[in-house]
């Protein structure tokens, strides 16, 4: 039942009602075999998307980050779409080595318009210092290292790391759950990568 309440909340937020409050609810008997569930819903204002402002970004121009978002001004604000596209902004930063980026969306309500202000703290770019490979009992380490699309000294790039994991899996020696972890090693945010095959 809790999942149903969460789905109802998500439905409202997908349709512009970002302040929706679901509950409390009451269970009332209907005869001997049935019950009725009465759920109180406070919808709040239905907001339309009013645009995005961005501050704190230095690496990417604001227009490039805004292009990630597909909602059109005047459309009902869709929380699910916004959250997915915000994850895409994070991925964009991760792919350039900004694994410590922190983005805070602030919602500014002007009438029935919702303007989103993204406050970005990019922090330092992470360089890879060393790559450690563990769990290998099937082939020479150099065979695995040839599959890596990243090297010590490179900036961490999420897509290259994911392709490296796939390349290692494609060798056919290892299970698909090749795990990757990283350890910060200095105040600049540089990292050592740990690949467990």
Predicted features by range, described:
Residues 1-197:
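Periplasmic polypeptide-binding modules associated with outer-membrane biogenesis and secretion
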């Amino acid at each position: 039942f809790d999942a149903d309440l969460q789905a109802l909340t998500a439905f409202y937020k997908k349709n512009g009602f970002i302040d929706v409050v679901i509950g409390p609810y009451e269970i009332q008997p209907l005869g001997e075999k049935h019950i009725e569930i009465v759920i109180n819903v406070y919808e709040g204002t239905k907001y339309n998307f009013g645009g995005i402002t961005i501050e704190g970004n230095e690496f990417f121009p604001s227009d490039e980050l805004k292009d990630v978002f597909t909602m059109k001004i005047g459309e009902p604000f869709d929380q699910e779409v916004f959250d997915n596209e915000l994850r895409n902004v994070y991925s964009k930063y991760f792919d350039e080595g900004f694994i410590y980026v922190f983005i805070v969306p602030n919602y500014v309500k002007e009438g029935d318009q919702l303007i989103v202000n993204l406050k970005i703290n990019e922090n330092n770019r992470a360089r890879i210092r060393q790559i450690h490979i563990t769990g290998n009992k099937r082939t020479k380490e150099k065979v695995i290292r040839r599959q890596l699309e990243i090297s010590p000294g490179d900036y961490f790039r999420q897509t290259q790391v994911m392709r490296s994991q796939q390349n290692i899996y494609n060798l056919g020696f290892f299970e698909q759950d090749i795990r990757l972890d990283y350890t910060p090693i200095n105040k600049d945010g540089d990292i050592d990568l740990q690949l467990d095959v």
